[in-house]
Amino acid sequence: MRVAEGFSQKWNFPNCIGAVDGKHILIRPPPDSGSFYYNYKGSHSIVLMAVSNADSNFIYVDVGTNGRVSDGGVWDTCSLNQHIEAGSAGMPDDEILPNSSKVLPYVIVADDAFPLKRHIMKPFSHRNQNLEQRVFSYRLSRARRTVENAFGILANRFEVFHKAINLDPTKVVKIVLACTALHNYLRTAPVTPNVCSVANNENTEDIPGMLPLEYEQQTSTINGTIVRDLYMKYFNEEGAVIWQNRHT
């Protein structure tokens, strides 16, 4: 519940228990691997799927799926999604929203690379959004920025992500896991003169060793659509903040 409190207090998104995104980590393909690691950009990679808290610390990572798997397929096969679908992820019970009578599920915020489901919220399509939809998409995108920020800090702190990693993929997995653990440690440990401090930087567009997930058409569930509409109504009514319309 501490994660949800963080998103509510810092990013004005109640009942949010994380922000999810993924990156292709570029590698040099092993001999005789063929197109096994070949991704949508024509390079070779493994995928890092991660969830962050409101402070841009990683609270879940899944790394190692080969880049050939579609990005939707990576989410489908990752352990977190499988536990959510099976009801074994330990999701909190639905909770009443602040200053409201609406009882809604806890959710993870995502972007267009992910499906819309009861516990996975994504923005509305960018085409022909009305004001209420734009407000929802803005509020969600603010909260989701935390995971982009986490990736940006990770990539800028560890230069191993600045080019394709020329090691066996099993070793790359261990390196990525170690870097995410060190990222969390350095985010929470007292700064010392021997530890370089890296400013928050959510820009991963110019990191040569990382690629974003490919946006592809994802199926929306009926429950996901209903929950998103209820959050939209909340953000435009009792959950509105005075400055939100300036950004829509």
Model-predicted segments: where are they?
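Short, polybasic Lys/Arg-rich linear motifs in disordered N-terminal/cytosolic regions
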Residues: 1-248
